[in-house]
């Protein structure tokens, strides 16, 4: 465990090299942001967006600080991006959930109240983690991998859910294996066992088509999965909390309050 400058702690997800590690490239880590005044024992693992090319800070640290402000511990997953390809980011997300669940007592969280949250391509990763059930090469190497990897809930912000939504994210994720995109498409993998979802999007998102979110929630509804969806009539892509100088949209800021109420409904907080 390493202490970071802002007071949070950073954990390597594997003690030795991660499966598929490339020398000189990113090491997948999990940054822990504990709430100073906890009001519940749920927690959220955050995956920033960035088309699998980078990770956008306003969609990870910003979310962590917001979750801390409502009394929840949060984790930011520094998952692997290009030149890594599928399934490395998924492997990292599964490992993060297993790591937190394995160490739930140490973190003071309920192992059955671990949500995964993501925006844009990070939303794709969160949804894929919630729907992909096949074993991945590199799993099963230690006792952490024996722990269940499925999150208990998914929080999706303007997510990429299929090729129609944002083809480029799939091209970066899959590289020369783009023709295999169906195996990495949450829309096609969802079933009656998919975790409950909170999702928001804007109807005028010119980057990631809102219709993917509509189709995903419709499919989950047909399977009997609990959904809460908010579609705002106007708004650009990548707003995050919609409250900073670059992404300021007061009307859309209300999604965070709706998320807080949803988390309370599912007993992640008790405020």
Language-model-detected regions and their locations in the chain:
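Conserved alpha/beta-hydrolase "acid-adjacent" motif
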Residues: 206-215
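Short beta-strand/loop motif that positions the catalytic acidic residue
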Residues: 199-201, 205
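Short beta-strand element of the alpha/beta-hydrolase
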Residues: 41-49
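Primarily recognizes the serine-hydrolase "nucleophile elbow" in alpha/beta-hydrolase
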Residues: 95-173, 177-182, 186
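N-terminal cap/lid segment of alpha/beta-hydrolase-fold proteins
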Residues: 1-39
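Catalytic nucleophile-loop/oxyanion-hole region of alpha/beta-hydrolase
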Residues: 55-57, 62, 75-111, 248-252
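C-terminal catalytic histidine-bearing segment of alpha/beta-hydrolase fold enzymes
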Residues: 31, 214-271
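Active-site glycine-rich loops that stabilize anionic/oxyanionic intermediates
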Residues: 48-53, 203
């Amino acid at each position: 465990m390493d202490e970071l400058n802002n007071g949070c702690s950073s954990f390597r997800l594997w003690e030795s090299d991660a499966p598929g590690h490339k020398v000189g490239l990113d090491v997948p880590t999990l940054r822990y942001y504990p709430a100073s005044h906890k009001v519940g024992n749920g927690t959220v693992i955050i995956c920033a967006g960035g088309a699998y090319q980078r990770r956008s800070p306003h969609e990870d640290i910003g979310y962590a600080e917001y979750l801390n402000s409502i009394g929840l511990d949060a984790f930011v997953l520094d998952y692997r991006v290009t030149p890594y390809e599928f399934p490395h980011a998924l492997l990292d997300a599964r490992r993060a959930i297993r790591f937190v669940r394995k160490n739930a007592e140490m973190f003071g969280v309920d192992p059955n109240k671990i949500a995964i949250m993501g925006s844009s391509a990070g939303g794709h990763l969160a949804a894929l983690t919630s729907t992909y059930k096949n074993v991945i090469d590199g799993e099963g190497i230690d006792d952490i991998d024996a722990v269940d990897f499925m999150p208990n809930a998914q929080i999706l912000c303007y997510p990429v859910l299929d090729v129609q939504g944002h083809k480029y994210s799939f091209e970066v994720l899959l590289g020369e294996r783009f023709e295999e995109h169906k195996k990495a498409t949450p829309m096609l993998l969802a079933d009656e066992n998919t975790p409950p979802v909170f999702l928001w999007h804007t109807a005028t998102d010119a980057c990631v088509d809102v219709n993917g979110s509509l189709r995903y929630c419709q499919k989950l509804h047909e399977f009997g999965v609990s959904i809460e969806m908010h579609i705002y009539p106007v708004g650009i892509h990548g707003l995050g909390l919609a409250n900073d100088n670059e992404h300021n949209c007061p009307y859309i800021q209300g999604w965070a309050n709706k998320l807080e109420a949803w988390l309370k409904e599912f007993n992640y907080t008790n405020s």
